Every structure is written in C-alpha cells, then in structure tokens.
C-alpha cells in the first residue's frame, strides 16, 4: 500500500522515523518542522519538507492551500517539560507545553483536515502517561490527556465523512526528547520499533495504538490501584527523584 502522508514533528524522534519509513515504503511524504537543516536532511531522503512553527496558524493555512488530497495525516509534533512544584506552579511552563502539544494540534487540524477525504486517516500522537498521573507531569500529562479526548470526539464527528481517527499512545521511546529524562524509563523501545508498531496499527485501521504491551499493562494495573495506595507509591517515586 502507498499513498500521500503528511507528518508534523518530522525532524526528530518518532516523526522522523515515520517519515523515513513511509518514504521507503513508496509513499509520498511531506515532513513538517521548524529546523531548516533537519528538513534538508529529510529532503535528501526524498521527503518533501515543509517549514513552519506549529503555533503559526496563518503559515500553516498558506502551506495547506497548496497541498493535494492526503491519505494520511499524522499529528506528532510535541514537547515535554516537567514541573518542580518546590519552586511553585510554573504557569509559563504550563502555557508553553499546552500551546505546543494541544493548541498547535488545533492549528494543524484547522489547516490540514480539509485535505482529508473519505477513506483517509487522521492519527494523533498522545502518550501512555494519560493512563496514570505521574509526578512532575502536570503540564505534559494534561496536554496529552486533552489529546485523548480530542481524538475520541473527532472519531465520532469524522466517521460520517468516512475519515478514520487513530490515537497513538507510546510508552518510553528512545528519542532526543526522552534522552533528557533524569529517571528510569522501563520497557524503552527504539524509534524503529515505535515506527513499525505505528505503521502496522494504521494499516490495520485501529482506533488506538499503544505499545510496548508490557509497559501498557503495567500502567493499567497501577491505574487500577486505590488512590491512597498510588499516592504512597507516588511519594516514593518523588523521593527517589523520578518524574513521578
């Protein structure tokens, strides 16, 4: 199978690997990002580069107007910053993460959703963190939980137009973003493994894609614990300096 796919956040991590793998599979790929040098590296691989800031809705609208119909739209761009409540609630950090992970996704939907016709797919990359409240993840977790709800409502509303919606919820993936983490990351997978799991799930038309399985089951198990017990475990994680 081949077609046309646009991927945001394509200059690094999961997005970059997806762009490369879809291109190698014969797809026409548009890769989006802010970094000109990284976009040029994608262009050298046969990927069509689109440079814009995800917070710039006007720039996205101009770019989208020149695009053909898409078979697949993958909204992957995002960032993670952890909060240290010992210093107080950082409203500026919270706003930055919400703007990058949630508001920019809304801008991308406004710009690129009209390029999807009946039979096409929309994929939104959330996070497995939305299954379980983790320490210091007030901003990141809130932004990803909001994407869960967004994907669920879009799935209902776009079904009448014949557009499938998939929510992707990865566990820890070895990327430049997670390389900054200062805590253990169980069941860490490579970007190649993540890309394969995502491409398989999208090809199968799944509503949700989550991986790796062992980590997801662990999160679900912990999420089923009584709140009081999880609070005690959370305090232990905080005392050990994890992002809990």
State what each model feature region is.
Residues 11-12:
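Conserved glycine-rich cofactor-binding loop
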Residues 44-58:
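Rossmann-fold cofactor-recognition segment
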Residues 76-83:
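Conserved NAD(P)H cofactor-binding loop of Rossmann-fold oxidoreductase domains
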Residues 84-86, 90-96:
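Substrate-binding pocket helix/loop in short-chain dehydrogenase/reductase
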Residues 109, 143:
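Active-site helix of classical SDR
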Residues 127:
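Residue(s) in the substrate-gating loop at a strand-loop-helix junction
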Residues 167, 183-218:
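C-terminal helical subdomain
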């Amino acid at each position: 199978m081949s077609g046309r796919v646009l991927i945001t956040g394509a200059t690094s991590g999961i997005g970059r690997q997806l762009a490369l793998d879809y291109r190698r599979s014969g797809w026409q790929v548009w890769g989006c990002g802010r970094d000109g040098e990284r976009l040029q590296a994608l262009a050298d691989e046969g990927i069509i580069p689109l440079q814009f800031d995800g917070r710039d809705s006007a720039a996205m609208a101009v770019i989208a107007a020149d695009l053909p119909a898409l078979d697949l739209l993958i909204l992957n761009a995002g960032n993670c910053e952890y909060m240290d409540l010992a210093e107080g609630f950082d409203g500026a950090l919270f706003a930055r993460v919400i703007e990058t992970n949630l508001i920019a996704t809304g801008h991308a939907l406004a710009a690129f959703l009209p390029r999807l016709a009946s039979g096409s797919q929309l994929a939104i990359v959330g996070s497995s963190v939305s299954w379980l409240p983790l320490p210091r993840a007030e901003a990141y977790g809130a932004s990803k939980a909001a994407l869960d709800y967004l994907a669920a409502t879009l799935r209902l509303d776009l079904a009448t137009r014949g557009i499938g919606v998939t929510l992707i919820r990865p566990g820890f993936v070895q990327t430049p973003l997670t390389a900054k983490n200062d805590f253990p990351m169980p069941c860490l997978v490579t970007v190649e493994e993540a890309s394969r799991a995502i491409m398989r799930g999208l090809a199968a038309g799944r509503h949700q894609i989550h991986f790796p399985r062992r980590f997801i089951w662990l999160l679900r198990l912990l999420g089923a614990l009584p709140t009081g017990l999880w609070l005690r475990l959370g305090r232990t994680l905080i005392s050990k300096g994890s992002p809990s």
